[in-house]
Amino acid sequence: MARKTPIERYRNIGISAHIDAGKTTTTERILFYTGVTHKLGEVHDGAATTDWMEQEQERGITITSAAVTCFWKGMDMSYPEHRFNIIDTPGHVDFTIEVERSMRVLDGACMVYCAVGGVQPQSETVWRQANKYKVPRLAFVNKMDRTGANFFKVVDQIKTRLKGNPVPVVVPIGAEDNFKGVVDLLKMKAIIWDEASQGMKFEYADIPAEVKETAEKWRENMVEAAAEASEELMNKYLDEGTLSEEDIKAGLRARTLAVEIQPMLCGTAFKNKGVQRMLDAVIDYLPSPVDIPDVEGTDPDDEEKKLARKADDGEKFSALAFKLMTDPFVGQLTFVRVYSGVLSKGDTVFNSVKGKKERIGRIVQMMANERIEVDEIRAGDIAACVGLKDVTTGETLSDVDNPIILERMVFPEPVIAQAVEPKSKADQEKMGIALSRLASEDPSFRVRTDEESGQTIIAGMGELHLEIIVDRMKREFNVEANVGKPQVAYRETVRKTVTDVDGKFVRQSGGKGQYGHVVFTLEPQEAGKGFEFVDEIKGGVVPREYIPAVEKGVIEALTSGVLAGYPVVDVKVRLTFGSYHDVDSSEQAFKMAAIFGFKEAARKANPVILEPMMAVEVETPEDYAGTVMGDLSSRRGMVQGMDDMVGGGKAIKAEVPLSEMFGYATQLRSMTQGRATYTMEFKHYAEAPRNVSEAIVAARAK
């Protein structure tokens, strides 16, 4: 089966934005204009095509990124047919993991901003992630029809807040109620959309007198940006004073792909204006799989050995599993991005991370909530496979004889935990299955059993994250659950170095005894460095075969600190000395000796409790700014700054301990009459003040 669309005409793009910038509506319009959906779905009615979990439709926010395939020939049908794979990404800070995961498999991104709200905190997080994966991007300023819309203010904010380099390729005609259309700065024509045909029809017109000067100024800016792409274009521009449409496109494309500039467009998705021109810009400026560097990976047998794969059907097969979903009809769906080669249904592939073979049952391409079965997928494709038994997010699938591990994604540690139990005892097993399914879909969500209480503990990235998990258990698996009060994931560490601490485990009272003896030095490491074990035994005073048992013992002891039983982090343990008995020593004895030795050393090394600190940003009308700052300070928060917002109001940044943020949403609503919003994400662990840690220790001792 030959390829229908040449790979140069593929565009794998993500659409990402802050909540309520109108991202899902924008995606809906794309699907409408590209002919995938015949009736427009509105988030307002809970009928958007990409929001396919019931909860997303109820809450009007997108939680999981659905991958949708569609085709586009340009708004005036002037392009050959291009194939878009669009990944709709969530904009809520509790779901940053989803965004991170989508960024990994995208070639380009479309950042949607609200013309009134401008660059909001979540937009900064997404921008940082796009920088991390070097994703070329466009910016689309949506909601130009809303009161207070200001396109140029958003251009400014992208420069100042995100340190971006935006280059408008259109400018708006009018704003708010009289937003009519845009001026295309390449053609220097006005584009006016026809509302009756829901934006399917449009006309080119002369530029209205009132925007002529603005259009000329920004065209000059755009041509200069394009000219900087190469010496050749710069000379042409200096000689002729302008550039042709082809040259401008080529220059802007080269600089966008190099992540030097971001072409900017505007419109209103809800009123069907401007999205069509944005789709043309995706073709003009965003990369095809061939335009990005070859994907790199390592050899599973030799981590030092770097391998690369070209985006070519002739290459050996490699793909990345970037999302798992449980589907009501076919069971587990594994979304994959194919980087090289061809995958046909029935093929056997190799999961190079786990070292296991997998057989591909069926392959489906997603048209939002419709599925189309296909026989094969090729380099550059994004599709879902059915029938993979043991693949988790971020793992590589490759050719059986030519394995490769594409980079692993790094997932954040959860910061909030809750005990959860089924409402009826009979559902215990069902709940276990549901939670392990959900954990395999979402690596930032963890499940464990508390040894002491036997309770099931779920942990995640925020209150909303866990709320949605519990909600999904009820809807998708019919398990109703009660949840306990949220618990903060505290940690412990030590502050001073102690040397020569003995750990002994001796049971010798006739017959086969037990004997293990170790001597440790315990020292603190800098924050985030993690645990390190160093074997400094000389002359075999502790035999080689027992060293792994000693390390195992220390690792076990790390799970429960000496102050309040929280996990211990950022310490270095040196095994410096010890002794053994020919008959009575065993691995178990040395493991026990190591546990005792570590606990003893930790007690002497000035142990402290660490608490998670959150970066909190509150957007509030100016009248309430003082109240909000006072409240944050009373929560042991450090206010770090205050910025002005586009549509008036203040953005307050602070660092606040997570333990003080429970129930903040309700409190903030009542303080500001529901007019302020906030986002919060984990920043780092910091030492808890003495009175706080004493309270934590006392609470654990009860």
Curated annotation (Swiss-Prot):
Residues 8-290 form the tr-type G domain. GO terms for molecular function: GTP binding; GTPase activity; guanosine tetraphosphate binding; translation elongation factor activity. Its main location: cytoplasm. One of its GO terms (biological process) is ribosome disassembly. GTP binds at residues 17-24, 88-92, 142-145. It comes from the Bacteria. Catalyzes the GTP-dependent ribosomal translocation step during translation elongation. During this step, the ribosome changes from the pre-translocational (PRE) to the post-translocational (POST) state as the newly formed A-site-bound peptidyl-tRNA and P-site-bound deacylated tRNA move to the P and E sites, respectively. Catalyzes the coordinated movement of the two tRNA molecules, the mRNA and conformational changes in the ribosome. This is Elongation factor G. The gene is fusA.
